A protein has these predicted regions:
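Structural signal for the N-terminal portions of transmembrane helices
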Residues: 40, 161-179
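Intrinsically disordered, low-complexity non-transmembrane regions of multi-pass membrane transporters
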Residues: 68-76, 190-219
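Transmembrane helix-loop boundary segments of multi-pass membrane transporters
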Residues: 1, 20, 96-119, 132-137, ...
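Helix-loop-helix junctions within the multi-pass membrane cores of secondary transporters/permeases
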Residues: 45-122
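Alpha-helical transmembrane segments
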Residues: 67-75, 123-137, 196
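Transmembrane alpha-helix boundary signature
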Residues: 16-31, 56-64
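Alpha-helical transmembrane segments and their helix-start/interface "positive-inside/aromatic belt" motifs
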Residues: 1-10, 175
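Hydrophobic alpha-helical transmembrane segments in multi-pass integral membrane proteins
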Residues: 19-21, 146-164
């Protein structure tokens, strides 16, 4: 009975979501991209950064993932740090996508160094950060990115380069959004390692200073 009710609610939610996508999100994203690109193409870079932050804040799956990570790690990795890392990563990815559309260069200039950096970081950070980073990449490139950011990027490309360049320059934004958390979340892990190392050095220094003071007092 509960499964049947769940299926019905899921179907109704899917119908409402797809209706909103086709009637609202996709047309608005496309028209907004065209209008802003024709007005001032360079403004879309900063706007892309802002949109990335808003997409992360509006994506329900991201909040679910952040909550699960905080619970499983018992607060070692907080929701706030995860949310900050994803906001920075996704915002930067969309902004860089706008730069690529404006200056018309290959996606490989982002993808190859990006995955090289993410794989290099995986050699140094704790495995939990690498696993969370890859899951975050899949979650961040969810419905909000596909139904609003991608049409927005297509609109920007049409406004800057023309319709002929859409297949060459507009697509790839979702790939960058999926790649960005691989770097930013693992950078959180690298930061945690550096922070722990500094704390250990400070603790050792306090112990040595206390031991030296005891020796001086004894003498």
């Amino acid at each position: 009975m509960r499964i049947g009710v769940g299926v019905i609610f899921t179907y109704i939610g899917l119908v409402i979501f797809l209706t909103g996508v086709n009637v609202g999100f996709m047309p608005i994203g496309y028209k907004l991209g065209v209008a802003l690109a024709e007005m001032n193409p360079y403004i879309v870079t900063g706007l892309g950064l802002l949109m990335g932050v808003l997409v992360v804040l509006a994506e329900p799956a991201i909040h679910v993932l952040n909550q699960q990570v905080e619970e499983i790690t018992q607060g070692y990795i907080t929701r706030r740090s995860m949310l900050a890392g994803l906001c920075i990563g996704v915002g930067a990815a969309i902004a860089l996508s706008m730069v690529r559309i404006i200056f018309d260069f290959s996606l490989a200039y982002y993808i190859i160094p990006g995955y090289f950096i993410s794989l290099a970081l995986s050699l140094f950070v704790p495995p939990v950060y690498t696993a969370i980073a890859f899951d975050s990449g899949g979650v961040a490139s969810g419905p909000m990115t596909s139904v609003f950011i991608l049409p927005f990027a297509i609109g920007v490309c049409v406004g800057v380069q023309g319709e002929a360049a859409v297949l060459r320059d507009a697509f790839g934004v979702v790939a960058l959004v999926a790649m960005a958390p691989l770097i930013t979340i693992q950078l959180l892990g690298f930061r945690a390692i550096v922070h722990n190392h500094i704390q250990e050095k400070r603790a050792m220094k306090r112990i040595l200073d206390a031991a030296d003071q005891q020796i001086i007092n004894f003498m």
